[in-house]
Amino acid sequence: MRIVFCGTSSFAVPSLELLASEFEIALVITQPDKPAGRGQKLTPPPVKQKALELNLNISQPEKISFLKEELLNIKPDIMIVVAYGQIIPKSMLEIPTFKSLNLHGSVLPKYRGAAPIQRALMQGEKETGNTVILMSSKMDEGDILSVESIPIEQEDNYEKLSNKLSIKGAKLLKDTILSWVSGSIKPIPQNHQEATYAMPILKEELRICFKTSAFSIHNKIRGVYPNAYGVSGDRNIKILKTNIVEKDLNLKPGELFYDGKSLFVGTGDLPLEILEIMSLKGKRVSGKEFAMGYLNQVKKFY
């Protein structure tokens, strides 16, 4: 089985690794290297790093349409797309003998789009999963070949949940490929009336508005982990982990309070206990450590 694999983010890495151990990967298509970090150093995407480690052929086109002729020459049996980041023309999706499959990190038709895991957490969902679809010209609207659900745990944040889904999704994808090629599964159309959408996370969404509910703030912190922040004066301080407290501490939104054991912040309704936060020196610390070291400098978030 000759596979062309399209993927970019760390979510796609377990799928590439597992498929490479079972099948022939004729080509890995991934996004171009991009500047990253404080030094803005040109950095290869996670899929490229894994493909280099596996000694696979790699292509990084600015537009995937540039590779149509190469795809025709490769004559793949199937194309697999996992967190790639570009719209692939229908004419290319239909080149492989068994067409093109996509692993998506939600139970479709819920959370179609670029940020399904983040948005599910931000909405406080109790369950999510993976879906493998037969790709169509419209994003995430293809017929369903397989689906698997998992519970969202209280301790899950974006990093933890994405990691779990990527590992489970790799196995689901491998099993689905074998079933699809053997003809033992049939595509099931999605119910488009039940579709919801997971739009990309905007920079302005990372800032916490403490006038909103404790539920929405707590789930934002989980969903965009580790990037949600509160503003105090000229400081942006990342809050990494919280717990909703079912008692009235009479705190105004953004007001900080330390009771000698725990650090709390006021919201639009219930207080939040801050369990983990970035110190003013950029180090991860507990709420208690932050209170003992910085509460004289940071008394309120705005």
From Swiss-Prot:
- Name the domain of life: Bacteria
What's a Pfam family this protein contains? Formyl_trans_C
Q: Which SUPFAM superfamilies match?
A: FMT C-terminal domain-like, Formyltransferase
Asked if the Swiss-Prot or TrEMBL record annotates the protein with the keyword Nucleotide-binding, the reply is no
**Which InterPro entries is this protein grouped with?**
Fmt (IPR005794), Formyl_trans_C (IPR005793), Formyl_transf_N (IPR002376), Formyl_transf_N_sf (IPR036477), Formyl_transferase-like_C_sf (IPR011034), Met-tRNA-FMT_C (IPR044135), Met-tRNA-FMT_N (IPR041711)
Q: Which GO terms describe its cellular component?
A: cytosol
In which residues is (6S)-5,6,7,8-tetrahydrofolate bound? 106-109
HAMAP family according to UniProt: Formyl_trans
Which family is this protein grouped under? Belongs to the Fmt family.
* Name of the protein in question: Methionyl-tRNA formyltransferase
| Biological classification of the source | Bacteria, Pseudomonadati, Aquificota, Aquificia, Aquificales
